[in-house]
Amino acid sequence: MTVKVVEGDFLQGASAKYAIVVGRFNSFVVESLLEGALDALRRHGVAESQITVYRAPGAFEIPLLAQQVAVRTKPDAVIALGAVIRGGTPHFEYVAGECAKGLGQVSLQSGIPVAFGVLTVDSIEQAIERSGTKAGNKGAEAALSALEMVGLLQQVGE
């Protein structure tokens, strides 16, 4: 008897429809995340006509917009991008926590994968590192996660 292993890959998601929900706040970082996500999707065969970018004011608003996009447009995956940078007040914890929790709920309630590409960092330097310099581009990583999940979910039940 052989154990069946089901994994996603980056090829099956090329024909899928993707929604990218982007928080505008901290745009100097977020625009690099968006470029990374778009580049990753293009490199894996996703046509620009299959990608729609939606812009929310900030990270706190991303979950509601992602939920409405999921319900109204039925993409195969949502890619959430934003940046929450810690300051001197508890604001960071509220925004970062609610954004993460909200996006998890959107995914579970809609049945549509939501890739989490929202940076939650302690400093501007960390944000810059994670948006295309030393630590890679977390926007590209979120796009790859979305591609993989689309392919994986296509195989569930086969």
UniProtKB/Swiss-Prot annotation:
EC number per UniProt: 2.5.1.78
Pathway membership: Cofactor biosynthesis; riboflavin biosynthesis; riboflavin from 2-hydroxy-3-oxobutyl phosphate and 5-amino-6-(D-ribitylamino)uracil: step 1/2
Keywords (A to Z) from UniProt: Riboflavin biosynthesis, Transferase
Active site per database record: H91 (proton donor)
Gene3D superfamilies per record: Lumazine/riboflavin synthase (3.40.50.960)
Reactions that this protein is recorded to catalyse: (2S)-2-hydroxy-3-oxobutyl phosphate + 5-amino-6-(D-ribitylamino)uracil = 6,7-dimethyl-8-(1-D-ribityl)lumazine + phosphate + 2 H2O + H(+)
Gene Ontology molecular function, alphabetical: 6,7-dimethyl-8-ribityllumazine synthase activity
Domain of life: Bacteria
A Gene Ontology BP annotation from the UniProt entry: riboflavin biosynthetic process
InterPro entries found in the cross-reference section: LS (IPR034964), LS/RS (IPR002180), LS/RS_sf (IPR036467)
Its biological purpose: Catalyzes the formation of 6,7-dimethyl-8-ribityllumazine by condensation of 5-amino-6-(D-ribitylamino)uracil with 3,4-dihydroxy-2-butanone 4-phosphate. This is the penultimate step in the biosynthesis of riboflavin.
Subunit details: Forms an icosahedral capsid composed of 60 subunits, arranged as a dodecamer of pentamers.
Family per similarity comment: Belongs to the DMRL synthase family.
Name the UniProt record assigns to this protein: 6,7-dimethyl-8-ribityllumazine synthase
Phylogenetic lineage: Bacteria, Pseudomonadati, Pseudomonadota, Gammaproteobacteria, Oceanospirillales
Gene that produces this protein: ribH
